[in-house]
């Protein structure tokens, strides 16, 4: 009787497993114009993870509100180790939702998509043969917990929305470069863990009105490795638009950022320059194909959700069909960037080049002013149109830099080094005190933003001068060698004149302050004595007086001139000296040890 009993038990387990799967009933409410609350979202993913062996829900770190950042993974062969998945030649997609919880369609759409995938609706499960899916259910948890019917008041559903900013009143889609929030650091940990080939962030836009429910921001192809960029522009993007047109009732158009900012779409739209503080700008630094869906705020919420479900399906289908080439191009880019010498820090739109784009819009009506009041224009839905418009897609480099062999960072700035470590950057430390000949930057000029941005008065239009000099370094100071697949991130964060560098975000601002200086009354006689003894200095002083009349009559300017040309000025050597130095080539007898300190244990 032993074997029949075992067989019966096995059959019972199979039946129970099948029944268990059949019992999954996710209560999505988007057809009722409602988005799930945070606890309902996590409960939905917990149900899916409990019922399907191909799914797993894990915590990846803390967020500013104290709640964990979750990652939901779907793997067809139940292998949830991304390294192992990649070793099998599979592709990985990461989907981020709820960065702005007032734009929630991606939250509900991702649950619907995951459920459809796991229960093999429309034969979707085949995509899991070579694609692993990672989903961040809600990124801005603090904003999601603060719900109101008055957030996003001009939005056509859902009835209740979350708050745009997080628990620290920061916009998380401006924090990916500087990573001040626990959310951003937990995202970096998640991104490093998965090392995705494709990334998607879901949003809603409240810009112009037109006939499309869903629009798409794609990272600039020119920012990618040339091989990846060519594939992205010539195959991936056109095919995604084509697939949405063919397989979705909604269709899709590039994100509408108007070229004239006056409301006339017919004058053309421009490709979005996604700087590294945005999610897609950040992820593309690591050779990842990056997208941001932007649903139109005026379209009904259920339609917005369904359009995102459709895009998730088509993005996964494309990745499934082209996984081999996607993987090959990314792997090649990861290797090539280690040897790449020149990096672009800033870009400028080229308005002399445009492509033709078929666009479906509405006539824009601008009423005449009434009784001295300016009447706001509107889009007349009774007057639809379809026409070809210019689409400006070309950005040219306007600021480039040649990477050094390594960057040297004094240990006094360890908080900046921690930011590098959060992003998987390999760091070394000096084994002994030493003097090193390095290339240094002096900050000659910088402009401050007039208003706070993310709690910062950002440094803009930074001008630097270069001085080669020997600097003292000490045991424990940091060295970051630029032979890494994350070189693009390293360079853009550590070059002070890069628009999104750590310097731009004020992490080195103390160097802009001067503290050592002379007292006018007690120091004048000492300087005059120096002038009498130094014939060359006296001659330079007289020449300056002849050349500059204002200088000749300004005693304070003359004292400053003497001070700056005296040995005493050596104390000012560190004034406005950017502390991160460039080591152009590897020195002889350069003793380093790997820094094994981790940063995630403290989170």
Give names to the regions the model predicted:
Residues 10-17:
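Hydrophobic h-region of N-terminal signal peptides that target proteins for export
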Residues 4-8:
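Alpha-helical transmembrane segments
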Residues 3, 18-603:
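Structured catalytic-domain cores with a bias toward divalent-metal coordination
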């Amino acid at each position: 009787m032993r074997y029949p009993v075992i067989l019966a038990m096995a059959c019972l387990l199979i039946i129970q497993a099948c029944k268990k799967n059949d019992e999954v009933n996710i209560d999505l409410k988007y057809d009722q114009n409602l988005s799930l609350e945070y606890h309902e979202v996590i409960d939905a993913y917990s149900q899916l993870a409990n019922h399907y062996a191909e799914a797993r829900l894990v915590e990846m770190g803390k967020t500013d509100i104290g709640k964990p950042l979750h990652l939901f993974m779907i793997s067809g062969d139940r292998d949830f180790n991304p390294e192992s998945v990649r070793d099998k030649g599979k592709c990985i997609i990461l989907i981020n939702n709820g960065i702005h919880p007032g734009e929630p369609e991606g939250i509900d759409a991702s649950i619907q998509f995951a459920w459809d995938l796991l229960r093999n609706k429309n034969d979707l499960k085949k995509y899991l043969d070579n694609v692993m899916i990672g989903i961040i259910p809600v990124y801005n948890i603090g904003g999601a917990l603060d719900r109101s019917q008055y957030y996003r008041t001009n939005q056509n559903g859902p009835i209740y929305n979350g708050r745009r900013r997080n628990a620290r009143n920061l916009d998380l889609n401006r924090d990916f470069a500087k990573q001040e929030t626990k959310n951003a650091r937990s995202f970096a940990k998640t991104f490093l863990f998965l090392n995705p080939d494709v990334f998607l962030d879901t949003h809603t836009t409240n810009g112009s009105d037109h006939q499309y429910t869903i629009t798409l921001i794609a990272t600039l192809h020119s920012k990618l490795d040339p091989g990846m960029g060519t594939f992205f522009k010539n195959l991936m993007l056109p095919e995604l638009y084509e697939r949405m047109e063919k397989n979705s009732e909604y269709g899709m158009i590039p994100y509408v950022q108007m070229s004239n900012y006056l409301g006339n779409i017919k004058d053309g739209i421009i490709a979005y320059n996604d700087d590294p503080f945005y999610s897609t700008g950040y992820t593309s630094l690591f050779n990842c194909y990056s997208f941001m869906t932007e649903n139109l705020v005026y379209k009904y919420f259920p339609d917005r959700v369904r359009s995102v479900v459709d895009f998730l399906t088509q993005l996964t289908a494309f990745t499934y069909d082209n996984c081999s080439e996607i993987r090959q191009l990314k792997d090649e880019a990861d290797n090539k960037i280690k040897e790449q010498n020149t990096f672009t820090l800033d870009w400028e739109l080229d308005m002399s080049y445009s492509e033709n784009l078929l666009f479906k819009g509405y006539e824009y009506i601008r009423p005449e002013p009434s009784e001295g009041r300016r009447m706001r224009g509107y889009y007349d839905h009774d007057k639809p149109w379809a026409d070809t418009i210019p689409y400006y897609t070309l950005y040219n480099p306007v600021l480039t830099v040649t990477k050094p062999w390594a960057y040297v960072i004094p240990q006094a700035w360890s908080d900046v080094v921690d930011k590098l470590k959060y992003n998987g950057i390999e760091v070394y430390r000096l084994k002994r005190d030493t003097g090193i000949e390095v290339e240094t930057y002096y900050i000659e000029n910088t402009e401050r933003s007039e208003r706070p941005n993310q709690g910062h008065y950002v440094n803009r239009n930074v001008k630097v001068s270069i001085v080669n000099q020997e600097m003292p370094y000490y045991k424990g100071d940091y060295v970051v060698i630029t032979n890494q697949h994350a070189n693009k991130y390293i360079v853009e964060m550590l070059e002070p004149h890069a628009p999104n560098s750590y310097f731009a975000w004020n992490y080195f601002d103390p160097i802009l302050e001067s503290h050592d200086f002379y007292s006018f009354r007690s120091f004048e006689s000492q300087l005059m004595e120096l002038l009498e003894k130094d014939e060359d200095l006296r001659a330079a002083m007289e020449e300056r007086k002849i050349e500059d009349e204002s200088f000749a009559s300004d005693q304070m300017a003359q004292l400053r001139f003497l001070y700056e040309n005296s040995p005493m000025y050596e104390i000012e050597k560190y004034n406005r000296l950017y502390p991160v130095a460039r080591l152009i080539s590897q020195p002889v007898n350069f003793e380093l040890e790997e820094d094994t300190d981790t940063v995630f244990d403290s989170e």
